[in-house]
Amino acid sequence: TATEGMVLLKNEEVLPFDKTKISKIALIGPNVKDSQIIGGGSAGLKPHYEVHPLEGISNFLRDERVKINYAKGCHVDKYLPALEKESSYVPGKKENGFEVEFFRGKTFDGEPIAKQVLSGNRFWALQGFAREFLDEKERPELSVKFSTTYKPPISGEYEFEVFSIGLSRIKINGKELVDNWSSQKKGEAFFGFACAPKRNKIKLSRGREYLVEVEYEFEGRFPAIQFGCRPPDPKNLLEEAGKVAKQSDAV
């Protein structure tokens, strides 16, 4: 099946592109802007830097007067992507990311025992999450709160998702939106130890500030949580890709 699904293309003097003959180039696909550059698990190493196709090609053609036309084309995510970094801020600050607060026990009462700022949407033990607590002699029992101020880039219906090893939920402006806390089903993520993802949708307005809080409770030495959000599509993605291709000299 894998062999039959492959298509072999012959390069008949198409590549490499002649920059002197191209004024517009189309970059189409969901991995053009944010590509998957490494694997998961033991292959999930964090590189010193990343260059994704849109960024790399744009930098290469920066001085060539070549216009880059980008279109996402479709969604291929198994899990929802992270909140846009440029639209998410530590509450009360201009810094992008989440304020992460750690509490002892199963509640969020009192002052947090530790705070840090993190970015991304996947946090687990094998990448160093909560490392300072996992080395303790006593089996850790912690509650963690991820908080960010989110300013939606467009108005519409946003879909949020969360799953974890342990209990998790998402709140928007203090109101619970996604509940993977009161009941759970077995999932596939994190070596099959996590619960299945749960999702819910909410209408948000462009430019308005929303407090997004992800609450997480775990017991043991293998914390793992992932959460994401898909914003509404401003256009029909497939139609947009077709228009971009027609308007370009190379795709």
Please name every model-derived segment:
Residues 1-18:
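Cofactor-pocket helix-loop regions in the catalytic cores of large enzyme subunits
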Residues 2-6, 51-54, 238, 248:
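Extracytoplasmic/secreted envelope proteins and their assembly/folding machinery
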Residues 5, 25, 57, 103:
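Conserved hydrophobic/aromatic pocket- or pore-lining residues that grip, position, or stack substrates
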Residues 22-32:
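Core structural elements
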Residues 33-60:
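Glycine- and acidic-residue-enriched helix-capping/strand-helix junction motifs
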